């Protein structure tokens, strides 16, 4: 494989010295960019865009042409695994993702196959290989998956949810069925991420978007336990280099210590967690990624720079920080504000690295 020219993102995840704090943005390939909208229109719909390796590669590279980002992230969706299990993923205008055949009981779980990443999910691996080739070693490529709990919420609820009553009913009334589903998903995610790593992903991230809706006890049992299983099963070295793993539970700031015990390399923080506090608690074990409120990108560039300075000062001197937003970038953010954010991180962070 091509020699990596900019490895500061990988180095920061492993708490190794860097010249400036690396930065990328969750959903950096997305609807805030006019060129993304044009490519998506060309593809026809969202899943067609995900399934076309050349177009998925194009949208992955678009933000890198605009901004000096320190990593690319695979353009895909967390719901590829449930889709490959046969649940019939479709997107309803204004509704988000839906499934034609949601999981309602243990019998449904028993019927679910564990998808072969190079077969039913081969289009994702083709995209990874294409992106790695086209990146030409400029920056590392991040692969990702949803967490078992988060995937299960969509599969059991039949789509997006605000109250999560359907999956919580299963969790409390038929926990055995839910554990069977989560176990199957943990196996599927492990295979899927390992296939991404073999195809060329240089780091992987597990997005636990809905872990924060659980009680602490339920989080340990129904979300973290299965993420820990995945981390245990991941390829941690490929192509002669360590493959760092980041866990991100949105709303999970109270559980950082438990998350750091999984053996992951880094934790993602949302904007509700104080980064100085997070570093005091777990900075000796893991790197931290985050954590500016994505809505800050609506502010004037001078205010964005102030916020970047505050977060950098909060983390403080030394290694182990990857700058990011606390969740995905909003679709109506002015692209030049995202540019001001990226520039500010690089310009203001050099003083923290000796």
From Swiss-Prot:
User: GO BP, one example?
Assistant: protoporphyrinogen IX biosynthetic process from glutamate
Q: Which UniProt keywords apply?
A: Cytoplasm, Decarboxylase, Lyase, Porphyrin biosynthesis
Q: Which residues form a coiled coil?
A: none
Q: Where can this protein be found?
A: Cytoplasm
Looking at the record's lineage, which domain of life comes first? Answer: Bacteria
* Principal cellular location given in the protein's record: cytoplasm
**Which Pfam families does its entry note?**
URO-D
Pathway field of the UniProt record reads:
Porphyrin-containing compound metabolism; protoporphyrin-IX biosynthesis; coproporphyrinogen-III from 5-aminolevulinate: step 4/4
- UniProt KW Lyase keyword: yes
- Residues the entry annotates as binding substrate: 27-31, 77, 154, 209, 327
Please report the name of this protein according to its UniProt entry: Uroporphyrinogen decarboxylase
Task: Supply the source organism for this entry.
Answer: Salmonella agona (strain SL483)
Can you tell me which family this protein belongs to?
Belongs to the uroporphyrinogen decarboxylase family.
What does this gene product do? Catalyzes the decarboxylation of four acetate groups of uroporphyrinogen-III to yield coproporphyrinogen-III.
Name the site position(s) for Transition state stabilizer: 77
């Amino acid at each position: 494989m091509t020699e990596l020219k900019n490895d500061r993102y990988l180095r920061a995840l492993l708490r190794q010295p860097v010249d400036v704090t690396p930065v990328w943005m969750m959903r950096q390939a997305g609807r805030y960019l006019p060129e993304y909208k044009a490519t998506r229109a060309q593809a026809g719909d969202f899943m067609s865009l995900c399934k076309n390796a050349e177009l998925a590669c194009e949208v992955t590279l678009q933000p890198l042409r605009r901004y000096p980002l320190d990593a690319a992230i695979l353009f895909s969706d967390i719901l590829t695994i449930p889709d490959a299990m046969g649940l019939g993923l479709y997107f309803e205008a204004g509704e988000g993702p839906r499934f034609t055949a949601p999981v309602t009981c243990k019998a449904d779980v028993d019927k679910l196959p564990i998808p072969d990443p190079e077969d039913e999910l081969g289009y994702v691996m083709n995209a990874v290989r294409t992106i790695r080739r086209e990146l030409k070693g400029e920056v590392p490529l991040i692969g990702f998956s949803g967490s078992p709990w988060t995937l299960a919420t969509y599969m059991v609820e039949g789509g997006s949810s605000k109250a999560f009553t359907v999956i919580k009913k299963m969790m409390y009334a038929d926990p055995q069925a839910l554990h069977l589903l989560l176990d199957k998903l943990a196996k599927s995610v492990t295979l899927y991420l390992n296939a991404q790593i073999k195809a060329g992903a240089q780091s992987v991230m597990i997005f636990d978007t809905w872990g924060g809706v659980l009680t602490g006890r339920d989080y340990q049992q129904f979300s973290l336990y299965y993420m820990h299983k995945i981390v245990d099963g991941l390829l941690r070295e490929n192509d002669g280099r360590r493959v760092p793993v980041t866990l991100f539970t949105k709303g999970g700031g109270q559980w950082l210590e438990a998350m750091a015990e999984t053996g992951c390399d880094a934790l993602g923080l949302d904007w509700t967690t104080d980064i100085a506090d997070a570093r005091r608690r777990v900075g000796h074990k893991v790197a931290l990624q985050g954590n500016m409120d994505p809505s800050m990108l609506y502010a004037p560039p001078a205010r964005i720079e102030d916020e970047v300075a505050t977060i950098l000062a909060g983390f403080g001197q030394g290694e182990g920080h990857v700058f990011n937003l606390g969740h995905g970038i909003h679709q109506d953010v002015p692209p030049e504000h995202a540019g001001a954010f990226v520039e500010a991180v690089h310009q203001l962070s050099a003083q923290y690295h000796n």
